[in-house]
């Protein structure tokens, strides 16, 4: 789950320390900035389709947050969900027919089907703002993403600290 606070049921989802024996890194991208990119890259857009896999809780979380930000900007937002990869083509086609621009959050199912999405969105002339680099390189026009390399490196440092007898309940959660 992208938001560890949601996964752990923490009251303060923005806290950097869990207070329990859990630590690590998170790959949550800057969602407010990604939402702003929609307006920046497609300034005439009025309708935004958010395309994601309904089976991925992290994607639903991102869709909710980005959707709220886009609505605050005065854009009409509609979510288009696929339960699995078999539904992506039909859902993408529907989303493209009803949207000026698509937002695809960090989503494993969508990432593995980026070519399918691109084969539908590009001929339809519907640009895609992506939640991460992999989706962007497959079907997007822009992203503002995190670095999986940096996250992995930081996780390695944290693992070293744990193995060197640090106390995980004192260690802050970090995002890069």
PLM features: residue spans?
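Structural motif
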Residues: 81-96
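Short beta-strand elements of ligand-binding domains
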Residues: 1-7, 24-25, 128-132
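Conserved small/polar residues in nucleotide/adenosyl-binding loops
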Residues: 168-175
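Conserved anion/nucleotide-ligand pocket segment
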Residues: 44, 48-53, 58-61, 65
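Small-residue-rich helix-loop
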Residues: 138-139
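Hydrophobic alpha-helical segments within soluble ligand-binding/sensing domains
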Residues: 7-45, 146-165
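Periplasmic-binding protein-like
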Residues: 1, 48-51, 99-110, 129-131
């Amino acid at each position: 789950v992208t938001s560890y606070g949601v996964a752990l049921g923490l009251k303060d989802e923005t806290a950097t320390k869990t207070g329990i024996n859990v630590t690590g890194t998170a790959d949550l991208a800057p969602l407010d900035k990604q939402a702003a990119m929609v307006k920046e890259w497609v300034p005439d857009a009025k309708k935004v389709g958010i395309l994601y896999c309904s089976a991925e809780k992290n994607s639903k979380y991102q869709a909710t947050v980005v959707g709220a930000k886009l609505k605050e900007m005065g854009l009409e937002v509609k979510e288009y969900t696929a339960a699995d990869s078999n539904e992506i083509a039909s859902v993408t086609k529907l989303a493209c027919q009803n949207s000026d621009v698509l937002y695809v959050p960090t989503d494993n199912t969508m990432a593995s089907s980026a070519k399918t999405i691109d084969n539908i969105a590009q001929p339809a002339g519907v640009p895609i703002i992506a939640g991460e680099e992999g989706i962007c390189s497959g079907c997007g026009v822009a992203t503002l993403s995190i670095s999986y390399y940096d996250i992995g490196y930081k996780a390695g440092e944290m693992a070293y600290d744990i193995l060197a007898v640090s106390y995980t309940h004192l260690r802050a959660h970090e995002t890069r």
